[in-house]
Amino acid sequence: MVKEFNSLEEIQKYYDKESNTYVFRENDRYIDLVKFNFDLNVNANIDARDIIAWSINTHDIYAYDIKVDDIIANDIYANNINAIVIKAYDISYYALCFAYCSIKCKSITGRRKDAKHFVFDGKLEVEQDE
């Protein structure tokens, strides 16, 4: 099920006061894909199975840590990244970027002097422009 929202007011019915988060469920089923057609700025933790976006940065999603199964994006800008699979065009991180299975990108850069990026199982692929 896909659900699109055009304003913050439209998502209010999904707010769960007890957990202080939004739970996107209808008819006892989670909504598979939630699409926001407006700027969304939140001061919260983002726990997700997949984040699919054109860009993840301080203008779109600001987080000290991004922890998800898959990140698929053109550009990622974050402090730390912890994921199963990362597929991106450019990755810029502060101190640490790692994936359990793979990282595939055009560029990957740590902004701290001794920043590290690595993959536990699988490989890191930095594709060169042809």
Residue ranges with predicted function:
Residues 1-47, 82-130:
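Intrinsically disordered, low-complexity terminal regions
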Residues 43-95:
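A detector of tandem-repeat and repeat-rich interaction/domain scaffolds
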